[in-house]
Amino acid sequence: MTASIVRLDGPVAWEECGPAPDRILQGQPAHRAWNAFSDASGQFFCGRWTSSPGKWRVRYTENELCVITAGRVTIESVAGQRESFAAGDAFVVPAGFEGTWTVHEECVKFYAIFEPRQVRSA
């Protein structure tokens, strides 16, 4: 069987996806996502995500490539590093990152995530 190209810019079947209420710091952000592709290992997936304005805590166990296509966001680490992004910007959030996401205006992004399996020790 031959693998097929997967378009990320077509019609979207959005699913509600958080954030968890105990992580929200400001506003009432509503997230929706559409996973367009997942690999057979379940470690890599990509698609589109959207959020209404708000601020919430994050703790990444995965590596995520983000490409903002609409809106403005600010991401701040617990160490105080602050980066702002708008439509057309691309960035990576590495596994182990802890901090906050703030969405200033309705945001849409493409994402590609790699989340390695946990290795069990013998």
Which residue stretches match the model-derived regions?
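A generic structural motif
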Residues: 76-78, 102
